Amino acid sequence: SCIGRLRIRDRNDIIDLEGLGSGGWTISPMLDNIEILESDAEFILVLEKDAAMIRLAEARFWRKYPCIILTAKGAADIATRMFLRRINKELKLPVFTLVDSDPYGHYIHSVYLRGSKRLSYESPFLATPNIKLLGVLTRDLEKYKIPNDCRIPMNQTDIKRTKELLNEGFVKKNKAWETDLKLALKLKIKAEIQALSAFGFEFLTDQYIPEKLSTGDWI
């Protein structure tokens, strides 16, 4: 789903995504019927989780920080990736992901970045090569003093998946990404986006995201 500073035409209906409830606009797989009308957004934020979307929607995050927010509610489905690629191409805005600090979150970021291995033949039409990983980074856990009880020990599958990611060419090309995954492997910890709410519900919207965006703290 999608919400924020964007107006579209869906066949004959003009939809202002800023005025929708916390559920946002359900991204249509029939993108040929969608026309991008206007946007004064300054960036696009892609969220792994619906819970984070609801939090940002409740805070009307896009009013203070002009943006378009998308989520595929977990796995990066084709409709969401196609729509992201389309608005990215038409609006030419910076794009960021906010995912859990775990191998699956990093994998989801990689699917938006370059497409999935399973659909490699379609990847050029679905990828957003300029997307940046805003968080949650392993280094953020220390930087923002995330409490230990919000940090989760990695299991064997997590360790295996992290090692697999470190073997990927697209990770090796990005030294900051490689460093963050190596740190996760060294500490053997992971954390969910929700860990940030240890400091209160406003921490994500009022401090974490704005601070990282203003300081360029992404991968």
Task: Kindly label every feature range from the protein language model.
Residues 1-94, 103-219:
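Nucleic-acid enzyme cleavage-core boundary/entry regions
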